[in-house]
Amino acid sequence: MKIGIPREIKNNENRVGLSPSGVHALVESGHTVLVETNAGSGSFFEDVDYKEAGAEIVAEQAKVWDVDMVIKVKEPLESEYTYFKEGLVLFTYLHLANEEKLTQALIDRKVISIAYETVQLPDRSSPLLSPMSEVAGRMSAQVGAEFLQKLNGGMGILLGGVPGVPKGKVTIIGGGQAGTNAAKIALGLGADVTILDVNPKRLQQLDDLFGGRVHTIMSNPLNIELYVKQSDLVIGAVLIPGAKAPRLVTEDMIKQMKNGSVIIDIAIDQGGIFETTDKITTHDDPTYIKHGVVHYAVANMPGAVPRTSTLALNNATLPYALMLANKGYREAFKSNQPLSLGLNTYKGHVTNKGVAEAFEMEYKSVEEALQL
């Protein structure tokens, strides 16, 4: 199989689809890998590293896309839609429930798109989303602490406080991978941390994990309002695989927050959980202020720490990439149910229910679409 690794073009996206070690594994399995010039430089992988791993380095972006399978990090931008072709396997994060134009382009060009975030194990965990959820969760607490500083628009609070001064209050909505990792860092900074989740069993697990050092609260509209309005930092970390994020925090709740408080919407790439995060921001211009509250809505948070993120992502995605390359997508889907759940579009059909519902499109199951 011929595989392409293009350079990411999203604002300040410095991750790369595969590290040199991942490329080497594919080449050793008999596949041809084309890597776009400087694709890995943002993660401090140079062209020579890929060349030594067995890749062919190409300067033309079109050539990297003229392959059997493209492995990326983030969803293609509009300038890349022109490279879509029937039968192309696209393996990347897609978050299509918030990307109607991209979804339509994939359907029109009959691309076989596999989204990292919807690959799901029997225990409902997301093995290809988890590494970046861990990174984004940990970053969210660090970023929140930074933007609480007065010079960054915040109210001038130190999350850990000092003797005789209260700690900063951090509320995390969602107790999954991202929320749990946000709590770890917030606790490490000395903050007063509350996690809200809809699953009582998960709250029990979190209570055990943190030894009672975090407040675990059932998530419902009344509790969300109560804890949001008294918080200095609110982190949104709710995920429904493949579907748009639920808007759990209303504009009225935001209006009740203190001036200079901060919200971090980790779920913004799926539409966000705050009614007031009505636009996606970038690493170049990461925040805006609405109702006196600092809003951080960067959709590719892990892109700011690309070396860590690329290595973590490569560890998770490489086994699936090898499966697709070695077996072909049909046999790979047949033999691996979690991978088949990653299929979002197939030759003109939407094969993810959450995406179909988001845009009122016709849905076909993977088995029906592929006639497995």
UniProtKB/Swiss-Prot annotation:
One of its GO terms (cellular component) is plasma membrane. NAD(+) binds at residues 169-199. Its EC number is 1.4.1.1. Pathway: Amino-acid degradation; L-alanine degradation via dehydrogenase pathway; NH(3) and pyruvate from L-alanine: step 1/1. Pfam families: AlaDh_PNT_C (PF01262), AlaDh_PNT_N (PF05222). The active site is at residue 95. This is Alanine dehydrogenase 2. It comes from Staphylococcus aureus (strain Mu50 / ATCC 700699). The gene is ald2.
